[in-house]
Amino acid sequence: MSEIPAKTLKRRGALSREFLSGDGIEVGALHHPLALGPHARVRYVDRYDIEGLRWHYPELGGYDLVPVDVVDDGETLSTFRDGELDFLIANHFLEHTENPIGTIRNHLRAVRQGGRLYFAVPNKHDSFDRARPRTPFEHLVADDRDGPGRSRADHYREWVRLIEKRVEPAEVEARVDFLMSINYSIHFHVWDARSFGDFLDRPRTYLDNAFDIEHLSANGAEIVAILKKRDPASPRPRLWIPVKVDKLRRFLSTHGADWKGRARTMRAALGGATRASTGRRAS
């Protein structure tokens, strides 16, 4: 696993201080927990305890890992009650989930009305995923509807061929069988700035407008999104125009790290068609 640049970590911390407060969790923090402000308290959740993580990720042998306070599946969070949390952090986690839409649904369940989800995913163009195709939204819907087992082996084959660069069919299948047998955590899904913006917009309707997109920006080689859980009785959320997201991608690449206070510039970049939040203090 590569090191995260200090500038990226600094920007993450600034966003967390702006948006996150109260009691929350971070899923899969490993050796890079999110820096939080003084009004936020966090517990760390992972699918293995420290010993299990050390076995599963031998490449992290030289790093200090955060303590695992709760052992749970970060996709389902079955140990957490509905509305128990003020916030949930999952950096570089969604791409590892087999059912990202179902994961967002479960994460929303675990936070209170007005609670926030803080996500970061790698931009495929700036990562080892650059040779892989973007995951279509229709594929994600099928994984949610039919279960991720339908596509699991195909994801591992793509990983073995395009990331591990194995080409012999017998070798590929043997490697796929091994990785699946140990439930190795690959990047099941791939996004860039354009497709991730579209991915967040379309599930809003698919999930009955359960959240607002409060923040979306480029942050070095990653894309950061902050979602706010809506009260079902509140007015419909602000529009987010996916057909303009190619312009949004160019805007983010130029202005992403300084989005707050640029609403007028952003509306111009998007042709005046959208009203996206420029950020609010945590409440």
Predicted stretch roles:
Residues 93-94, 121:
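Hydrophobic adenine-recognition pocket in adenosine-nucleotide-binding enzymes
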Residues 71, 102-108, 113-253, 257-261:
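S-adenosyl-L-methionine-dependent methyltransferase catalytic module, highlighting the catalytic core
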Residues 1-11, 241-283:
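Membrane-proximal basic amphipathic "stem/tether" segments
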Residues 22-77:
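Class I SAM-dependent methyltransferase SAM/SAH-binding core
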